[in-house]
Amino acid sequence: MGSEMCIRDRNTGGKICFAQSKPVLQSPKKGDREARLFVTFRPTDKISDEVSTTSGYEYNSQNSIIASSGKSKYKFDIAQEDFAWISSNKIEKRIIKKMKKASRIMVTAYNKSGSQTIDHYSLMGFTKAYNSAKKNCT
């Protein structure tokens, strides 16, 4: 999955911890997109296991943002500008469980002009990064 970080929220002073990953493969290859996949913990706000993504551009509201691994698919049903979230904590728990077992996950999304992008994330090291983020923010 990549890495784990803990930071302080400048507004509340509360701790924010997250596991994050950069794509190992992107389609299309052209362009420099700052795509990421996150699982975040914000104890001050009573938020844990928050799954989010950014594809490095503002999303097209007419198309779905989907994470898929094997036969499992998960819809990011909240999108604001260049970030997307899953509104159901139950679904977030399912995707995290899948991320702990799988080796790869793909996020498919569409930019404002309707062009599709696919970001492939390795899940090697996800469980370690997730456990560390969770431990540091509880």
PLM feature spans:
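A generic "folded-domain core" signal
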Residues: 3-4, 8-138
